[in-house]
Amino acid sequence: MKKWGVGFTLLLASTSILAKDIQLLNVSYDPTRELYEQYNKAFSAHWKQETGDNVVIRQSHGGSGKQATSVINGIEADVVTLALAYDVDAIAERGRIDKNWIKRLPDNSAPYTSTIVFLVRKGNPKQIHDWNDLIKPGVSVITPNPKSSGGARWNYLAAWGYALHHNNNDQAKAQDFVKALFKNVEVLDSGARGSTNTFVERGIGDVLIAWENEALLATNELGKDKFEIVTPSESILAEPTVSVVDKVVEKKDTKAVAEAYLKYLYSPEGQEIAAKNFYRPRDADVAKKYDDAFPKLKLFTIDEVFGGWAKAQKDHFANGGTFDQISKR
């Protein structure tokens, strides 16, 4: 028994010595703080159990466009978890991510989805029920800046798509609608969380155009006695996307753990954590479990209405695009 005890102690000691300490950096968009705080703990425990290695994941959050620029400019992110595919494509165009990144994981590398809804003050004093209510005189709207925020670009395109569908796909009328909406915007923050703080903490505005997960978080954390969620008749299917940053993981030799980190988002535990943080899960079993948490509404996609992100970016958010045009007062 003594020999066995000594041998077991030595085995534990050698295993401890062989265990590696690994650090990853996840550069993410603005309102994913709570999601990844919870997910990172779960993945670290999973990886420890699978390999014996200790992995610590650091986080960086901000407007998705600004975050993509920081990775392009050299911040050593092992993975990016950004608001939309265009921002990952922008990094790929600079050679830091493989150009076929979107096909490396299921569902076009979007492990969870969301949509765009409205957050209003309790009692809905301005009677906001659908997109057309946002252009009424005297309605103060809060949304982030599409030049820096991925969520803001989803907001903008959701409004544009609604206007198209209610004006026989007339692009000029859709532009007039979105221009009228932005005339009612009181504050343009750089990111989605900043806009939430403007509306919730600073008390500015009658309605916040928000990620569904952000609106649900606000009502659940700050009280349903203060805010209400209004789900419009239709909105856009928002698909946040993820990728390893190839140049960084090759340099740091973190490819295996970085890939596993993203793949685990699709696991039952990863999907459960996404749902608990108010993202719509891809996994059918998890989605069924949380079915009552997510209202039914008509959803259109970026490809169906705008021809994909590259075209949407060029038409609407590049210099001289429709956002610049409607911003001229």
Swiss-Prot record:
Entries under Pfam families matching the protein: SBP_bac_11
GO biological process: sulfate transmembrane transport; sulfur compound metabolic process
Molecular function as annotated in GO: molecular carrier activity; sulfate binding
InterPro entries, alphabetized: Sulphate/thiosulphate-bd_CS (IPR000957), Sulphate/thiosulphate_BS (IPR034408), Thiosulph/SO4-bd (IPR005669)
UniProt-annotated location(s): Periplasm
Domain of life assignment: Bacteria
Main location, first listed in the record: periplasm
Coiled coil segments of this chain: none
UniProt signal peptide: 1-19
PROSITE patterns from the UniProt entry: PROK_SULFATE_BIND_1, PROK_SULFATE_BIND_2
Keyword Translocase listed: no
Any GO CC annotation of this UniProt entry: outer membrane-bounded periplasmic space
Keywords: Periplasm, Signal, Sulfate transport, Transport
Family membership: Belongs to the prokaryotic sulfate-binding protein family.
Function: This protein specifically binds sulfate and is involved in its transmembrane transport.
UniProt-recorded name of the protein: Sulfate-binding protein
Organism in which the protein naturally occurs: Salmonella typhimurium (strain LT2 / SGSC1412 / ATCC 700720)
